[in-house]
């Protein structure tokens, strides 16, 4: 099925019966591709539009990947991205451009433990339905810059530990964030170099 999926994607003729139907099918395909491609993995334009749950997708199979290009994935129906790249410890560069995240509700722990991640552009993500960003970037020790100023955080309820141990993240733009519905902001900037702190459940920039 996998070869059919990719060929039909490239031709723009993907039929419903040829797409991935479950998270398990996607993981099996990814594991096969990672085995073939090694440390530098390119899997573009994958149609996962029939799947709502991508949680822990690379957990246990992405440890040795250094560069990962997942641009153009069709993610319009995905609701759960919890721990998606959990402990991809060798990962330095990740390309997720073109993702439709408008229906995602949970991004908790999404990049948890990506200790060597240096390059990540998620500035254009639609986060209007996200409720949890808890520990989303926990332990991303080598990230130096992130522009998240365009994010809609009006429905987020938890940012606990979101930037925990992002010790090099000095260039972080959170301007315009709405934290009015957040219930838990504990440890949001713990051991983080970004010029922000939490005061009365609000994110305040340190001058």
Regions from the language model: what does each represent?
Residues 1-207:
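Negatively charged
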């Amino acid at each position: 099925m996998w070869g059919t999926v990719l060929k039909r994607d490239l031709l723009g003729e993907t039929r419903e019966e040829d797409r991935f139907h479950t998270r398990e099918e996607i993981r099996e395909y990814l594991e096969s591709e990672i085995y073939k491609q090694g440390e530098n993995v390119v899997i573009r334009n994958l149609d996962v539009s029939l799947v709502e749950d991508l949680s822990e997708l690379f957990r246990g199979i992405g440890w040795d990947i250094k560069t990962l290009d997942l641009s153009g994935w069709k993610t319009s129906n995905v609701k759960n991205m919890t721990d998606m790249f959990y402990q991809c410890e060798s990962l330095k560069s990740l390309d997720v451009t073109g993702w439709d995240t408008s229906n995602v509700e949970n991004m908790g722990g999404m990049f948890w433990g990506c200790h060597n991640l240096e390059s990540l552009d998620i500035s254009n993500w639609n986060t209007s339905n996200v409720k949890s960003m808890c520990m989303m970037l926990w332990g991303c020790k080598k990230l130096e810059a992130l522009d998240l100023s365009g994010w809609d955080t009006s429905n987020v309820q938890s940012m606990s530990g979101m930037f925990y141990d992002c010790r090099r993240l000095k260039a972080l733009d959170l301007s315009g964030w709405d934290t009015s519905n957040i219930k838990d902001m504990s440890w949001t900037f713990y051991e983080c170099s970004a010029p922000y702190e939490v005061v009365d459940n609000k994110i305040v920039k340190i001058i």
